[in-house]
Amino acid sequence: MKVRASVRKICEKCRVIKRRGRVMVICANPKHKQRQG
């Protein structure tokens, strides 16, 4: 899980979602998981 100020899609499979008021990226590739913070 990468914590970044700016989250963006890295590949086509990445999905930008909002969970508990936090913007997150979920993907089939675990390396692409990101959270805004």
Curated annotation (Swiss-Prot):
An example of a Gene Ontology cellular component annotation for this protein is: cytoplasm
Q: Which organism is it from?
A: Synechococcus elongatus (strain ATCC 33912 / PCC 7942 / FACHB-805)
The lineage's top-level taxon is Bacteria
PANTHER family the record matches? 50S RIBOSOMAL PROTEIN L36, CHLOROPLASTIC, LARGE RIBOSOMAL SUBUNIT PROTEIN BL36C
Q: Which UniProt keywords apply?
A: Ribonucleoprotein, Ribosomal protein
Q: What is the lineage of its organism?
A: Bacteria, Bacillati, Cyanobacteriota, Cyanophyceae, Synechococcales
Q: Where are the transmembrane segments?
A: none
What's a single GO MF annotation on this record? Answer: structural constituent of ribosome
Q: What is the designated name of this protein?
A: Large ribosomal subunit protein bL36
A biological process term (GO) from this entry:
translation
Q: Which family does it belong to?
A: Belongs to the bacterial ribosomal protein bL36 family.
